[in-house]
Amino acid sequence: MGDSILSQAEIDALLNGDSDTKDEPTPGIASDSDIRPYDPNTQRRVVRERLQALEIINERFARQFRMGLFNLLRRSPDITVGAIRIQPYHEFARNLPVPTNLNLIHLKPLRGTGLVVFSPSLVFIAVDNLFGGDGRFPTKVEGREFTHTEQRVINRMLKLALEGYSDAWKAINPLEVEYVRSEMQVKFTNITTSPNDIVVNTPFHVEIGNLTGEFNICLPFSMIEPLRELLVNPPLENSRHEDQNWRDNLVRQVQHSELELVANFADIPLRLSQILKLKPGDVLPIEKPDRIIAHVDGVPVLTSQYGTVNGQYALRVEHLINPILNSLNEEQPK
């Protein structure tokens, strides 16, 4: 024990702390520089689920808007839907070019305000094509406001976009898309209460010939959160609209099915003994019926008269028989 007694210098070092080692971080303990303040009101929310229904809506909207642009510009555009981006609003806003057409919309009955954003490149492409241009003389972005002519083209495109977006939502959850107003500066939009609030941003890339443009649909996550379960797990078969398409296709295929129509001219009751006595040249008298019933697969479908037309035997339809009602009548107990 005597050999383990500390010297006075060592005791002073323990009491006062070793100035040479006091700044060295202790393993496993975070230093002050690694600690960041946490504000629960501004931290971004983590959305891990894939919004499958929103992807379906975006694809349908792209098809609708493509047809609308074709009717407007008389040129066939190619619209590609980008990946859905879930990001803070300030990240979305800082990447917008100037000038930018910002259109505020409501999706009733959802609470909140969304954005339909047309980039200047898309606006200039639409104006150029609408007035017969082919893109050889691109318009330069100079930070100016849009002209009255450009604004009129924007309004026509926006009307097509809002109609298409409303139709795209009908299959999942019908919403009324309502235009609020337009802005050119993002600071006047205020679709979120904080720059760090999460938004759901979908970019759309438009190609017309060799020219490309872009527009975005940006929705606050708080706006569509009431539909979160529906957007994550879309209904089976995606929509009633697709169910109707399936029915229509089935009806068309059934209508093109080939059936054999059989018309019995007469029935002659004979015994087996009489049939066995028949020989070539025998004559079996029959009575010509006033009407003949035609069958499909044993089910009566129509009554007709028998005759000739242009030298060919033919049937003239007199009355259509409902095969379902006829079958039900036959199945009823007598």
Curated annotation (Swiss-Prot):
For this protein, the record's SUPFAM superfamilies field holds:
CheC-like, Surface presentation of antigens (SPOA)
Q: Which GO terms describe its cellular component?
A: bacterial-type flagellum basal body; plasma membrane
Instruction: Say if the entry is tagged with keyword Cytoplasm.
Output: no
A Pfam family it matches: FliM
Topology relative to the lipid bilayer, per the entry, is: Peripheral membrane protein
State its location(s).
Cell inner membrane; Bacterial flagellum basal body
Q: Check the record and name the Gene3D superfamilies matching this protein.
A: CheC-like (3.40.1550.10), SpoA-like (2.30.330.10)
For this protein, what is any one GO molecular function term?
cytoskeletal motor activity
InterPro entries per UniProt: CheC-like_sf, Flag_FliM, FliN-like_C, SpoA-like_sf
Question: Could you tell me the keywords of this UniProt record?
Answer: Bacterial flagellum, Cell inner membrane, Cell membrane, Chemotaxis, Flagellar rotation, Membrane
Q: Family assignment?
A: Belongs to the FliM family.
Known function = FliM is one of three proteins (FliG, FliN, FliM) that forms the rotor-mounted switch complex (C ring), located at the base of the basal body. This complex interacts with the CheY and CheZ chemotaxis proteins, in addition to contacting components of the motor that determine the direction of flagellar rotation.
Q: What's this protein's name? A: Flagellar motor switch protein FliM
